[in-house]
Amino acid sequence: MDTIENLIIAIVKPLISQPDALTIKIEDTPEFLEYHLNLDQSDVGRVIGRKGRTISAIRTIVYSVPTEYKKVRIVIDEK
């Protein structure tokens, strides 16, 4: 696991009710390094938060981690 993936897990796992259902798939696109968070449907609202404030805060923290050559993007998927 890389640093960004560990950071995402450390932030998201305490927020959700079913942490065992959390999986992260990394997709390398030409412009971005995308981290797809697969969550249980009941946990999606917790991670997004009211008016998107929680996911916005998570993205701010994750985007502050320096990467070598690509921008990082977080995508939330439902199971």
From Swiss-Prot:
Changing R53K: Still self-interacts. The keyword Repressor does not apply. The keyword Cell wall biogenesis/degradation applies. Changing I61Y: Loss of self-interaction, no longer interacts with KhpB, cells are rounder with less elongation, form short chains, pbp2b can be deleted, no KhpA found at midcell. It is found in: Cytoplasm. Keywords: Cell shape, Cell wall biogenesis/degradation, Cytoplasm, RNA-binding. One of its GO terms (cellular component) is cytoplasm. It holds the Pfam family KH_KhpA-B. GO terms for biological process: cell wall organization; peptidoglycan biosynthetic process; regulation of cell shape. Residues 32-79 form the KH domain. Changing I61F: Loss of self-interaction, still interacts with KhpB, cells grow at wild-type rate, pbp2b cannot be deleted, some KhpA found at midcell. Disruption phenotype: Cells grow more slowly, are rounder with less elongation, form short chains. GO terms for molecular function: RNA binding. Self-associates, makes at least homodimers. Interacts with KhpB (also called EloR) via the KH domain of KhpB. The complex with KhpB is critical for regulating elongasome activity and for KhpA localization at midcell. A probable RNA chaperone. Forms a complex with KhpB which binds to cellular RNA and controls its expression. Plays a role in peptidoglycan (PG) homeostasis and cell length regulation. The KhpA-KhpB complex stimulates or controls elongasome-mediated lateral cell wall biosynthesis. It is not clear what is the function of the KhpA homooligomer in vivo. HAMAP family: KhpA. Belongs to the KhpA RNA-binding protein family. This is RNA-binding protein KhpA.
